[in-house]
Amino acid sequence: MAALQQASRTVPIVFVTTIDPVGGGLVESLARPGGNATGFSTREFSMFGKSLELLKEIAPRMSRVAVIRDPAVAGGSGGFAAIQTVAPSFGVELTPIGVRTADEIERSIVAFARSGNGGVIVVGPTSSVQPHRNLIIALATQHRLPAIYTNTIWSKAGGLISYGPDNLDQYRRAAGYVDRILRGEKPADLPIQQPTKFELVINLKTAKAMGVTVPEALLARADKVIE
């Protein structure tokens, strides 16, 4: 995105899955972008509180949660802050884990898993977290750590459960902005839109491999179940 804006300050740009367009310098504000770019943000940090609720539902004895995130980006720090806010109400202790290297991730997850009654929340998706997707999923499964991820890609790759913005819905809504711009409206005047539809996906194959029993009530609420 930044490279596109540097290439042209006049060609209209509609982005779809940007986490923090204001913090990233893409727009001046959510209400009035002010430049040649507008679009749809995935920055809905309250969803991470919901993620903790879902994780507690699938693992009611869980008392410790490892939060895997990149603290250097808004998506990582903001997501962790949202989880911190609700953690006391669920009676869980949080352990932040960085994503600087694969070795750091592996050492941290292995050490965390030793104490038992743990779970994992992955805060993202950010460019620094995504490259470690398969490693994180494999470690969580191997050490029987119930884990929740941020979008369907993770659950399709073997993650236990995912909850986050429906990216396909974001793309459909973006088409409306493209149409409005083609009809003469300016990106600078089109406010940044937040997610309105969220998707819950449960991977039953992974649940069985981990020995996790998914409550029927949770299965009934899932948008997709992978078997």
Question: What is each PLM-predicted segment?
Answer:
Residues 1-227:
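Short hydrophobic alpha-helices and adjacent helix-cap/hinge residues
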